[in-house]
Amino acid sequence: MIERFLKQTKFTSVEDYNKNLEFIIPENFNFAYDVMDAWAEEAPEKLAILWTNDQGEEIRTTYGELKEQTDQAASYLQTLGIGKNDPVMLILKRRYEWWVVMLALCKIGAIVIPATHMLTKHDIVYRNTRASVKAIICVDDPYVVSQIQAAMSESPTVKQYITITNHGKPIPEGFHDWQSEWKQAPKFVRPAFVNTNDDTMLMYFTSGTSGEPKMVAHDYLYAMGHLSTGVFWHNLHEGSLHLTVADTGWGKAVWGKFYGQWFAGATVFVFDHEKFNADTLLRQMEKYKVTSFCAPPTIYRFMIREDLSKYDLSSLEYCTTAGEALNPAVFDKFYEKTGIRMMEGFGQTETTMTLGTFPWMTPKPGSMGIPNAQYDIDLIRADGTPCEDGEKGEIVVRVGDRKPIGLFKEYYRDPELTREAWHDGLYHTGDMAWRD
């Protein structure tokens, strides 16, 4: 698959990667059609998702079955009047349907806004208003539903509310019932035109240092930007069973359990749980023979407190971490207990993986790795001049004639904030680092 999108697909060194990473960019690229449906045609029986939960349930879905489900879901969403450029907010925790709906919305050109289940009424009204949200698809969690219902009278742009219920629970007033309705939709017909590469595909609300959250808008090439996340940072292949610990309301979900993993042809493993418990997580990894794992350092800290000798983790091949600084002591203890060196990475909601430790490198505890070759990264002083080695500075992305694949397109409806972060040929991350 990746040979369709990269001129060179294998690299043996940092120098090789930096020199030869080059994307093949199709016109009007759409991840749902050009990657997922392509896998369905090429390897329909290959497992795409292995979803499990803390109630002992599991769902195994092949690429072929996932195409059928996403087509059906896309058709259903169309019957509700949802189409190109319509913003749709998803509050779905780790429910299986999140993966189906994400792809279905991509197929009809709608704008997906994943959101956390912790939002209050105020948060929901703010998002609905700022993004002109047209529909909300949510879990049947009583708190989530209550906050959405409280926001209804102050959300005039929202025309459809859809809930995904569990085991026959009653449908909240004012909501469509996903389970009983989506399979009744007519056969899906792909729209004649869905998107250009520059159209907005995905938006995240991300908190700033002050004020209300920013709306980070990504185009359709953002998905391709995560090819390097899954294939090179996570080091995935077609035999991989990959687990990333992340709620679907945050950007880490598309980093770790969606785009890059499926570019690699891997199987996405999901553990849907209400409360984190290291022992339960480790038993899931043992039971299903997870081969690749990614989580924030905090999760690893909980894991190394367990007696890891109790678990058969012999299937585990590769581990990565991002989201916060990795304490070298955690790195050392995990390596001591498992023989696996964690490969750290760095990025933002505004980017894909910007810095990373790649398979052809020996990880250095306390280091985020090297710049990802799809970005031109530098460290600069407050006056804009480059930092010397060992000198602390701001991480910036140099932007040439064309925006790098994976970098956000704008802060939606906020040109002033966009200019503050993106000027003089640089995207300013606001994050500080030093180079050895």
Protein language model features and the residues they cover:
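Conserved structural elements of the adenylate-forming
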Residues: 67-72, 183-188, 216-237, 251-252, ...
